[in-house]
Amino acid sequence: MRLSISHETTYHYEDQVRASIQYLRLTPHDSERQRVISWQLDLPRPVRAQVDPFGNILHVLTLDEPHDAIIIGARGQVDIDELREAEHESQSAFPFLRSTRLTEADEALRGFAGQHCHQRRDRTALIDLMHALNQTMVYTPGATEVDTCAAKAFAGRAGVCQDHTHAFLACARSLGIPARYVSGYLYSEDTAHLASHAWAEAWLDDAWYSFDVTNQLARPERHLKLAVGLDYLDACPVRGMRRGGGHEQMHAKVFVAPTPVISVQQQ
């Protein structure tokens, strides 16, 4: 499947911002299950790409002139291998056993993981865990903040895809299974207009397997990956800091849709 993506993020500030810096992980890269056909960023000024410690493509946008708005755009086309269930990588999975403030498992999460996985440490066990988390934590926009940790979201029994993913990571790591946060996009036939998405990957049998708690999907057939990390802070598409500006309004618009692949026949 070939997906076309358009993602625009706009920031408006009530006062002039003296300076700002934005960390952008908005560029996908080729892997076993996705191939980038075309991609470009639309930014206020040219920025050189670099690679972060997790292998993500990173752009650092620095604006040192006064401004009251920023518009960040990304668009392109990517082919997705809908049949591939897992991805192999040469990088060690060991770092993804480490917990962070957002993914630390408390006694409740450790007990939940043990209850639903018992002594099993296979894909079936993690699929059961994924379904159990989805039933326990009701998808509720606005129930949590961007810095809400897994334990707090789990205790509140509500959250969004970020919280579902953090809770899954906390549980998997408590079982000794390397797991990582994934940011990207998901195409759904229900609507082409979606927000950016988040899901988890766990290291099993020397490969990374996907677990989308929010949508109860264990096969990434319509997922497009942007970045990975230990948690949201490592992999979120846009994260920044600024001096001045006062109150901020942020609006994100995402469009994801399939695109016909036209084959040219030679005569």
Describe each model-derived feature in a short phrase:
Residues 1-111:
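Linear, non-domain "peripheral" regions
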Residues 11-21, 140-150, 198:
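Short N-terminal helix-initiation segments at or just after the protein's N-terminus
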Residues 13, 78, 204, 215, ...:
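Short beta-strand segments enriched in hydrophobic/aromatic residues
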Residues 22, 68, 101-102, 144, ...:
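Short capping/connector residues at structural and topological boundaries
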Residues 78-82, 87-159, 167, 232, ...:
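Secondary-structure boundary elements
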Residues 163-246:
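Hydrophobic/aromatic-rich core segments of domains that either
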